[in-house]
Swiss-Prot record:
Keywords: Amino-acid biosynthesis, Cytoplasm, One-carbon metabolism, Pyridoxal phosphate, Transferase. Catalyzes the reversible interconversion of serine and glycine with a modified folate serving as the one-carbon carrier. Also exhibits a pteridine-independent aldolase activity toward beta-hydroxyamino acids, producing glycine and aldehydes, via a retro-aldol mechanism. GO terms for cellular component: cytoplasm. Homodimer. Its cofactor is pyridoxal 5'-phosphate. This is Serine hydroxymethyltransferase. PROSITE patterns: SHMT. It is found in: Cytoplasm. One of its GO terms (biological process) is tetrahydrofolate interconversion. Its EC number is 2.1.2.-.
Length: 433
């Protein structure tokens, strides 16, 4: 064939433009995203991506898995080490699948689960609209305290004692402040229930020692994503110290929720775990500093930043109320036009019906922190956001500023820089940029 098909040209063009736009030209403030290091990226594209390895390491239903067994076992060991856990399972291909496996083990259809309130950021997988509902488990929300922007502990204890659920979930997707694990765990266990902690957003902060470790405070099992504050490939994981629970969950993930578990994730996950072992504390601490700095700068620039009376945030996230600027949908779109990527989000006082045009915009600093930005850069970002949303400046002009600003921050930090990849490969596979 002398001429390549138009469709192929289009596929390559779209991929190149995506890489160029999101990787080189934008300020990405989506809290659920991050970037891998070049080292982790280099092992993501491998022969593992074509292979199957159903079951557990060294107990497979397929032949040809000796290296898959080794890499999965090593990745599990590294994740257990940084999580301070006895066990780790990396076969869940997302945080939602990790939740599904745990929920299925702990409750049957018709049973009750008490969840962190939606206002406190509960993820959709915790609700009747998501995984919980798909499994037929009844959702009961804990009371929410507007002042503390958190679970109302006293009322939650009373509810747990009355309902006697099979399990209780903490953790969320709009997650500014830690949920009360230590305060609730004894009462959860007193009624024979298990405490499930969804650390999808804060797992990198946990292993970086910038957030409390829920396993050390009484959680029975922790689920996570591997691509938010933990800057690995997209995927999920489960960690626990409970022997019996681990066996049940491990026997449920396969074959209930995954068959092949996307082996090509495992080398990248293992490298990211190593990066977090050696650089995670510095990275996580800078994330928290940057989030606080961004929140303070946004408030100084005239934005209504949620949680000011509590110090704005203790995580990687910042939330702003933009009702006076046209609402979350409008403002998030304006930001995107200026190459500032964020997402509209319900705020604690929004009704669920406002999901398509909520009061807020949710921000996260973990990716820009990985590219080396610090507190001063957060103040620059806040100023650029003011120009877009408050001063109504020409978004094209602001976009030029954003793109120019971003040129100074293209190198991933908090990684190993002394590895010669040429020693391990005769072909370097690079992004289409």
């Amino acid at each position: 064939m002398d001429k390549i098909p138009e469709e192929l040209e289009k596929i390559l063009q779209i991929t190149r433009e995506q890489n160029r736009w999101r990787r080189l030209e934008t300020i990405n403030l989506i809290p659920s995203e991050n970037v891998m290091s070049p080292l982790a990226e280099s092992v993501y594209m491998s022969d593992f991506m074509y292979r199957y390895a159903e079951g557990k390491p060294f107990k497979r239903y397929y032949q040809g898995t000796k290296y898959a067994d080794e890499i999965e076992e090593l990745a599990m060991k590294l994740v257990s080490e940084i999580s301070s856990s006895k066990y780790a399972d990396l076969r869940a291909v997302s945080g939602t699948i990790a939740n599904a496996g745990v929920f299925r083990v702990l409750a049957d259809s018709g049973d009750k689960a008490v969840i962190a309130p939606v206002q406190a950021g509960a993820h959709v997988s915790h609700t009747r609209f998501g995984t919980l509902g798909a499994l037929g488990i009844e959702q009961i929300e804990m009371p929410y305290d507007q002042e503390s922007m958190n679970v109302d502990v006293d009322k939650a204890i009373k509810l747990i004692e009355e309902v006697k659920p099979k399990f209780v979930t903490l953790g969320g997707s709009l997650y500014l402040f830690p949920h009360p694990v230590k305060e609730l765990a004894p009462h959860v266990h007193a009624v024979g229930a298990k405490l499930v902690y969804d650390s999808a957003h804060v797992y990198g902060l946990i292993v970086g020692k910038a957030w409390h470790n829920p396993l050390e405070e009484g959680a029975d099992v922790v689920t996570a994503s591997t691509h938010k504050t933990f800057p690995g490939p997209q995927g999920g994981l489960i960690v626990t110290n409970d022997d019996s629970l681990y066996k049940k969950v491990s026997d449920t993930i396969f074959p209930w929720f995954v068959s092949n578990h996307h082996l090509h994730r495992l080398p990248s996950t293992a490298i990211t775990a190593l990066e977090m072992k050696y650089f995670g504390k510095e990275y996580a601490q800078q994330i928290v500093k940057n989030a606080k700095a961004l929140a303070e700068a946004l408030a100084a620039e005239g934005f209504k930043v949620i949680g000011e009376h509590l110090g704005f945030t203790k995580s990687h996230q910042v939330a702003i109320d933009v009702r006076n600027l046209g609402g979350g949908a409008k403002v998030a779109k304006l930001f995107e036009e200026a190459n500032i990527i964020a997402n509209k989000n319900l705020l604690p006082y929004d009704p669920p019906s406002a999901v398509k045009d909520p009061s807020g915009v949710r921000l996260g600093v973990q990716e820009m922190t990985r590219f080396g930005m610090k507190e001063e850069e957060m103040r620059i970002i806040a100023r650029l956001m003011r120009e877009v949303a408050i001063e109504n400046k020409d978004v094209k002009e602001v976009k030029k500023k954003v793109t120019e600003f971003r040129k100074e921050f293209l190198e991933v930090k908090y990684t190993f820089t002394n590895v010669d990849l040429a020693k391990y490969s005769s072909k370097v596979i690079s992004l289409l940029i």
